[in-house]
């Protein structure tokens, strides 16, 4: 009897954890044309890279080249990239100017109520979340170790955390490092 109750509790916790992660696709955001955008195509990809950005954050400005290189590197692979602006402080024009000024080749979506950032626990920009096809978080944190403190950058990047996580997913291997600490500007 006790064994049965324990198994029932474990099953409930697993179910609740699984459902909470699967709420990610149901969050409604706005694209830059004012249309509702849902991250509901997760199942079409092995993984989705969600990048939290801020047009006003110097590190987000600096990382646009790296983000573009990643998008190019994984073009044609079952990896989707989505940029999230989690703030109501930026107008569509502000976001479009950021995208144009830094030649950012990324689909940007507005999260004015910070629903997705709260759901995922994002607090910094730039911060990435690699989400699996079923909505499970495979990796979260920094893109790489270029920035190691606010205003301080390495001349040589020695850890490519996001690339390592994506490569593991594409190779059907477990992601070794599941979480790192992102460095950047706070999401407000």
Predicted regions and their residues:
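Bacterial Sec-dependent N-terminal signal peptides
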Residues: 1-23
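A short beta-strand-turn-helix
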Residues: 27-47
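Short active-site neighborhood of thiol/selenol oxidoreductases, capturing the structured segment around
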Residues: 40-61, 166
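Loop/turn elements at helix/coil->beta-strand transitions in domains of secreted/extracellular proteins
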Residues: 45-47, 77-80, 104-106, 133
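Short, thiol/selenol-centered motifs that function as redox-active sites or metal-ligating centers
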Residues: 54-63, 88, 128, 185-188
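Structural microenvironment flanking redox-active thiols in thiol-disulfide oxidoreductases
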Residues: 61-102, 110-119
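Short, internal strand/loop/helix patches
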Residues: 99-138, 145
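Thiol-/selenol-based redox modules, centered on thioredoxin-like
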Residues: 132-133, 137-188
């Amino acid at each position: 009897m006790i064994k049965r109750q324990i198994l029932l509790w474990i099953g409930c916790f697993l179910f609740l954890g699984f459902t909470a992660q699967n709420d990610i696709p149901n969050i409604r955001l706005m694209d830059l044309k004012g249309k509702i955008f849902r991250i509901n195509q997760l199942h079409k990809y092995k993984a989705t890279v969600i990048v939290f950005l801020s047009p006003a954050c110097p590190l987000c400005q600096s990382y646009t080249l790296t983000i573009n290189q990643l998008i190019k590197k994984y073009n044609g692979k079952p990896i989707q990239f989505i940029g999230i602006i989690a703030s109501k402080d930026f107008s569509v024009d502000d976001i479009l100017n950021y995208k144009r000024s830094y030649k950012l080749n990324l689909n940007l979506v507005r999260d004015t109520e910070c629903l997705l950032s709260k759901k995922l626990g994002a607090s910094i920009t730039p911060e990435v979340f690699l989400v699996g096809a079923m909505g499970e978080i495979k990796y979260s944190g920094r893109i790489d170790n270029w920035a190691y403190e606010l205003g301080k950058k390495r001349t040589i990047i020695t850890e490519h955390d996001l690339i390592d996580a994506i490569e593991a997913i594409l190779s059907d291997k477990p992601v070794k490092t599941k979480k790192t600490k992102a460095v950047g500007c706070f999401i407000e």
